[in-house]
Structures are given as structure tokens and as C-alpha cells.
């Protein structure tokens, strides 16, 4: 099948409205959120999973590459082309029109189709007294449920571990190049692909069709695993073979039509403790006690260094206000609006580069102070900050421990009221985008960002990084923050103009190798990191012809994995 014949077939399947070939209009699908860009023959937006299957059939017949893409919010370019050096044309299948979520088993599980988002799932479950796997961070900017599963995404919630399921419906191309539909959802939906996909889309199945022993719907072992604080290995990271299972961790090497996931009861009684210290050993003691000794695991434990606090204070202020005013559920629309403004700005010669960021930063100067006095006082007194959230019996447990511990140590804590709780959580969220804003506003002095996503050994007591001067003097600002209980850190470095960011990153990664760290921890390899041998092997097993998302993890982009 020629390229023109393929385009004709795809148009017949989805209609002219939902196939895009104009490079100017496909840019938002071909370009990653932070990283990655390349050409594509077409972007196709199916409205049903049966259309998605027909698109894939045509692409296999035409021998083209297929990149399945949902929200395209990944930070490492994992759902876009990267460069133009593939040996076949690329078709991007964007799944966001297929956003159906079905609750099953008394709301204790959900079946999510490819376009469903974490944000949407959270809203659906809230009145039912349930929660999804993730309720912070990526859920706020529109990330998809399936994107999280396919990339073993982590998150702030200690008790739930990385996104994981053993129940999925997916398409695979076998070694002979034949397309197969595999139903491991544990739901009897019929025999043919057409029956299975149509019945699932329309929720044409009953309770008796649902198997209760079809597999795990989340990582059951993580609660005990994270408690092993003396183990010389990381708690969670993307290349961990223990969390690779078909769709889970597949990174687009399968086309996934649906996943079945567990939901979780809402934590009724919670409290947030804001902890400050100038001694990293004190935070280490708290982490080891909370994980190794507390009866109740923390809900979350988020670390912020003073310098990250300061950058977010200035460059995340408007983000803070927007979420406080409109709520996280409006953020996807606002991010989409921002992207539209930026695309318009590129076409208008007199507007500055990064127009929307510079405009919002200017406006933020006139906003009133947004942080409570208690947090500002701790910023002045203490270098290291920990936001510890506990639930149920863990509230009294943590309160008693912290009171006794700080009676004879140099740091301090306070229990947050409602306003302080909201401010602490929003400020932590604002840190994540502050470095990007800084880069956009100061593009005349910043070369670029180096953003590392790392998992330290669970027994690593010397967790705070000290860079050698030859690296440190090339950096304007360092932002350290992360999921402290899991020992997962996000480290954003704003690099001075004129330096080689890739070379600097390699030097930093070499230092992390010496410390026994793993990377990436939760953003997956995308086209930014090299996949470890076990991960490469997993990808080859899933996709022996290398037809899905080739080049991921710096692997071969050629058919049948040719070098």
C-alpha cells in the first residue's frame, strides 16, 4: 500500500475532520512537551477503539511506523517522533477522543479507554468515595491514565507505588508481522476483534462476564517494598523488570485499547506536617522512622530545598494563584490555551519568544503575597523542607513522633491548618514548572535546562547532592525537590549560556552511577535516556518488528531492530 493509498484508507475510517497532514497543524502532536520533534505522514484521531483497530490494520499493511499518543504531556519525548532518521513513514494515532471510563466491581475497579485522563478519573471517583492511583502532579495537566500505566509513572502517593496493572486489552505485531488483538482484561467480550472492541466501547458486558482472578490492578507489593530502608537498591524506577508486564511499562511498544485498574478508598482523616531543618540527617531519621517503624505508611512526603522554594516563590506564583482560584481541574484547558497563544506568537514577528510565559511573569509581579507567614519563617530558618501528609491512625503516630524527636534536635515542625495545607501543596506543585518559566523569561542568559529524574538507593543517607566546582560553576540555579519517602528526586539545573547541556548531563549521570542511583525514576526513558539492557529486551519481546514507537530509549529506529 502506497502512502497516498494509506491516507485514503485512514480518511475513510475516521473522516476528513479527524486526519491531519498539514505540518503546521500537526506540530502540536509531533512536538513533545519538553523534548522531541520529528516529521509524520499524518496524525489520525479515531473516535472509537474499533476505528483505532482499523487504523492499525491499514498501517501494518502499509508497513509504516505507528506512534500511539494520548495527552502528549510526557517530559522525555516518549510519544512523539524524534528526528527524521526512521526508515519508514510515521503515523501518529492520537487517542484523546476515546475518553470513556467504566466503573466495575462496586466501583473498586475501573476500565479506562485510551483517551481517559487522571483528572477525569479523579472527578468521576470523588462522589463515589474512591480515588485513582494518582491525584497530584500529572493529573493536573491532563495526563492520560493509559500513559501512566504504559510508562510505570510514579507519583506522590507512597502507599500506591508506580502505575501498574496485569489486565489490559492490546494489539501486538508478532515476529511474522501479523497483527494480533490480545484480551487480558479479564472480561468476556466475544471472540473476534470487532466483537471485543464494540462490546467494550458500549459497555455490553455483565457482572458474570468479569473474572475476579484475572491479575493485579495495582502494585500490591510496593507498600512492603518501600519500607525496606536498608536495601542498597532504589524503591522504584522505570527499568525495574518487576513492574514490566505487557501494557505496564510498554512505552508504546504495544497499542493499548484499555486497562483495568484498582481504585482506592478516600482517606477520611488526614493531617499535614510542615518540617524544617538544616541537617539532612534529621530528615533521614524521619523517613526511616515513618517507613520502618510507623504502623501507618505516610500518604505522601514531599521534599523542597530552600533554593527551589525561592525560585517557585517568584516563577511559580501565577501557577499557585490559578490553581487556588480555579482548581486543578481547569488546568488542562489553561495549558491548551497557553499552547495556542505560543503557536500564534511564533507567527507574529514583533512578539517576543516565549510570549505567554513572559506576559504571565509580568502580571505575577502585581499579585499579592501568596504564602503564609509560617512557611516564610521556615524558609528563612531552614534549608531543607518536608511536607509530610498522614492519614487515619498515622496522624497521631506522626504527631507524637515529631514532637518527641524535635524536643532534642535542631529542626522544627508545625501542623498545618487548612490554609497552610493548601499553600504547602500548591507551592510544591509550582516548583515543578518554575525552572521552565525561568528559562523562558531569561532566555538571553540561559542555555537550557538539565532536568534529572532519579531514584536513590533506599539505604542512601547522604542523599543531598554536592556537585564538583567544575560542574557547579556552569549552573545558574539548582532546584532540588521530590518524593522523599520513595527517595525519588527531581533535580532541575538552569545552565549558563554557552555551555554544552548534554555533556553536563552525562557528567552528572556518571556521578549518579557511582552512587548506585537509577534513572529515570518515573518519567521513563523517552528519547532522552538510554534504556538499560533489561528494558531493551522487554521492548524487543513486545515489538519484534520494531513497528511501534521505534527509537525509544535510544534503541534502533529501523525495522526488525536492524542497527
Each predicted region: which residue ranges?
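N-terminal flexible segment immediately upstream of the FAD-binding catalytic core
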Residues: 1-61, 74-110, 261, 308-317, ...
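General beta-strand structural signal in soluble alpha/beta enzymes
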Residues: 19-23, 45-46, 66-70, 77, ...
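Conserved glycine-rich FAD pyrophosphate-binding loop
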Residues: 33-41, 64, 69-71, 76-88, ...
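Anion-binding (especially nucleotide phosphate/pyrophosphate-binding) glycine-rich loop
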Residues: 83-98, 103-145
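FAD-binding subdomain of flavoenzyme oxidoreductases
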Residues: 119, 126-282
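Short, conserved secondary-structure transition motifs
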Residues: 143-150, 302-318, 424-430, 524-537
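C-terminal cap/substrate-recognition region of VAO/PCMH-type FAD-linked oxidoreductases
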Residues: 255, 260, 271-278, 282, ...
Amino acid at each position: 500500500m502506497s502512502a497516498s493509498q494509506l491516507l485514503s484508507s485512514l480518511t475513510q475510517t475516521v473522516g476528513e475532520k479527524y486526519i491531519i497532514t498539514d505540518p503546521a497543524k500537526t506540530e502540536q502532536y509531533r512536538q513533545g512537551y519538553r523534548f522531541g520533534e520529528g516529521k509524520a505522514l499524518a496524525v489520525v484521531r479515531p473516535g472509537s477503539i474499533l476505528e483505532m483497530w482499523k487504523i492499525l490494520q491499514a498501517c501494518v499493511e502499509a508497513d509504516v511506523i505507528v506512534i500511539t499518543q494520548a495527552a502528549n504531556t510526557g517530559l522525555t519525548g516518549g510519544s512523539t517522533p524524534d528526528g527524521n532518521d526512521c526508515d519508514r513513514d510515521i503515523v501518529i494515532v492520537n487517542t484523546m477522543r476515546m475518553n470513556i471510563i467504566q466503573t466495575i466491581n462496586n466501583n473498586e475497579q475501573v476500565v479506562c479507554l485510551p483517551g481517559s485522563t487522571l483528572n477525569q478519573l479523579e472527578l468521576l471517583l470523588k462522589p463515589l468515595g474512591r480515588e485513582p492511583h494518582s491525584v497530584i502532579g500529572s493529573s493536573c495537566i491532563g495526563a492520560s491514565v493509559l500513559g501512566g500505566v504504559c510508562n510505570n509513572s510514579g507519583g506522590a502517593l507512597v502507599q500506591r507505588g508506580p502505575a501498574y496493572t496485569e489486565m489490559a486489552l492490546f494489539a501486538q505485531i508478532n515476529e511474522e508481522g501479523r497483527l494480533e488483538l490480545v484480551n487480558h482484561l479479564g472480561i468476556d467480550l466475544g471472540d473476534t476483534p470487532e466483537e471485543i472492541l464494540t462490546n467494550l466501547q458500549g459497555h455490553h458486558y455483565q457482572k458474570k462476564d468479569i473474572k475476579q482472578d484475572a491479575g493485579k490492578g495495582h502494585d500490591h507489593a510496593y507498600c512492603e517494598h518501600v519500607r525496606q530502608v536498608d536495601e542498597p537498591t532504589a524503591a522504584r524506577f522505570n527499568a525495574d523488570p518487576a513492574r514490566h508486564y505487557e501494557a505496564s511499562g510498554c512505552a508504546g511498544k504495544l497499542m493499548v485499547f484499555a486497562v483495568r485498574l484498582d481504585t482506592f478508598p478516600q482517606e477520611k482523616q488526614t493531617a499535614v506536617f510542615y518540617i524544617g531543618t538544616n541537617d539532612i540527617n534529621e530528615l533521614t531519621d524521619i523517613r526511616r522512622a515513618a517507613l520502618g517503624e510507623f504502623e501507618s505508611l505516610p500518604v505522601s512526603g514531599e521534599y523542597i530545598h530552600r533554593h527551589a522554594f525561592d525560585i517557585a516563590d517568584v516563577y511559580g506564583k501565577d501557577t499557585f494563584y490559578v490553581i487556588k482560584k480555579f482548581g486543578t481541574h481547569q488546568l488542562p484547558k489553561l495549558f491548551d490555551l497557553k499552547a495556542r497563544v505560543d503557536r500564534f506568537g511564533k507567527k507574529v514577528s514583533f512578539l517576543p519568544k516565549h510570549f505567554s510565559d513572559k506576559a504571565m511573569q509580568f502580571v505575577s509581579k502585581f499579585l499579592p503575597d501568596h504564602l503564609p507567614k509560617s512557611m516564610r519563617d521556615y524558609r528563612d530558618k531552614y534549608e531543607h523542607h518536608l511536607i509530610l501528609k498522614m492519614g487515619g491512625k498515622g496522624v497521631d503516630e506522626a504527631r507524637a513522633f515529631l514532637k518527641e524527636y524535635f524536643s532534642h534536635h535542631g529542626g522544627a515542625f508545625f501542623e498545618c491548618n487548612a490554609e497552610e495545607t493548601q499553600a504547602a501543596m500548591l507551592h510544591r506543585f509550582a516548583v515543578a514548572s518554575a525552572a521552565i518559566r525561568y528559562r523562558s523569561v531569561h532566555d538571553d542568559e540561559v542555555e537550557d535546562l538539565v532536568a534529572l529524574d532519579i531514584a536513590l538507593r533506599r539505604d542512601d543517607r547522604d542523599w543531598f547532592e554536592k556537585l564538583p566546582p567544575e560542574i557547579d560553576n556552569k549552573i545558574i540555579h539548582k532546584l532540588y525537590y521530590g518524593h522523599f519517602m520513595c527517595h525519588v528526586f527531581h533535580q532541575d539545573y538552569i545552565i549558563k549560556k554557552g555551555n554544552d547541556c548534554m555533556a553536563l548531563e552525562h557528567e552528572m549521570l556518571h556521578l549518579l552511577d557511582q552512587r548506585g542511583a537509577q534513572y529515570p525514576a518515573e518519567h521513563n526513558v523517552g528519547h532522552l535516556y538510554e534504556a538499560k539492557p533489561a528494558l531493551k529486551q522487554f521492548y524487543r519481546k513486545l515489538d519484534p518488528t520494531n513497528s511501534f514507537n521505534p527509537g525509544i530509549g535510544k534503541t534502533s529506529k529501523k525495522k526488525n531492530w536492524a542497527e
